[in-house]
A protein has these predicted regions:
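Glycine-biased, low-complexity coil/linker segments
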Residues: 225-227
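Phosphate/ribose-recognition catalytic cores of enzymes acting on nucleotide-derived substrates
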Residues: 157-200
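A generic structural motif
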Residues: 91, 132, 144, 191-193
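Loop/turn elements at beta-strand to alpha-helix junctions within RNA-recognition modules
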Residues: 67, 146-147
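Short, acidic, Ser/Thr-enriched surface-loop or helix-capping motifs
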Residues: 119, 126, 145, 192-193
Length: 229
């Protein structure tokens, strides 16, 4: 429950830790579903997730607190009105400072439905990116997915020649014992209430990414809130 970043009558935003799946998979094990009862905060029903985050991606995850709230959030996501910003540390990096990746994506094979590949016949997929800092063969990117395909940011970065650091599927990281996927859902902005300003929520950089994010030039606050100097 300490991971709750925002709460009101309709919505929760939590800081999902890396390594925790959102939904149960065929292998079983611990998932976010096991913790939803602790996030009811007095309501009779458990909240439900309004979108996906990969198991190894950390950061902002939006939940609706009851059926009407979930329907409202689903509508906002369907209309592409929720602004999502990710931070990623990539190997190498783009030559420019900002741009777009417009590459259609499709499942890699029928038996690995959640592994994706670039495919001109696939679903249109668009990512906007901006370089925030660079250091020794690494680049910190701000990524904004305009579409929301499975593994979109990971495949788009890999196909552009700069895979996300710590990615064991699309990058160069080993399956076990790597540095951890350096992809973080940094912020969400949700126009939940028509007559009020959008709700903006930010998740702190996770521990496994702090060293390389700071090396790329970002002045991160220390856990007690002070800057690094």
């Amino acid at each position: 429950v300490s991971k709750v970043l925002y709460r009101d009558a309709l919505m929760l935003v939590i800081d999902k830790p890396a390594g925790l799946p959102v939904h149960p998979g065929p292998k079983g094990g611990e998932t976010l579903t096991h913790y939803l009862d602790a996030l009811r905060f007095g309501l009779p029903r458990r909240p439900e997730t309004a979108h996906r985050l990969d198991k190894d991606t950390s950061g902002c995850l939006i939940l609706g607190r009851h059926p009407k709230a979930i329907a409202r959030l689903n509508e906002l996501f369907k209309k592409n009105e929720v602004d999502k910003v990710y931070w990623a540390v990539v190997e190498g990096g783009p030559a420019g400072d900002e741009g777009e990746i417009d590459l259609a994506l499709a499942p890699k094979s029928p038996d690995r439905g959640w592994w994706m590949k670039v495919d001109p016949k696939g679903q249109p997929s668009l990512t906007k990116w901006r370089a925030l800092g660079r250091n020794e063969g690494l680049t910190l990117l701000e990524l904004r997915p305009v579409t929301g395909r499975t593994h979109q940011l990971r495949v788009h970065c890999q196909a552009s020649g700069w895979p996300i650091l710590g990615d064991p599927i699309y990058g160069t990281a080993p399956r076990f014992g790597g540095p951890g996927l350096h992809l973080h859902a940094r912020s969400v902005t949700v126009p939940l209430y028509p007559k009020k300003a959008p709700i903006a929520v930010e998740a702190p950089v996770p521990e496994h990414m702090r060293e390389r994010v700071a090396a790329c030039g970002m002045d991160l606050p220390l856990p007690d809130g002070r800057g690094q100097g």
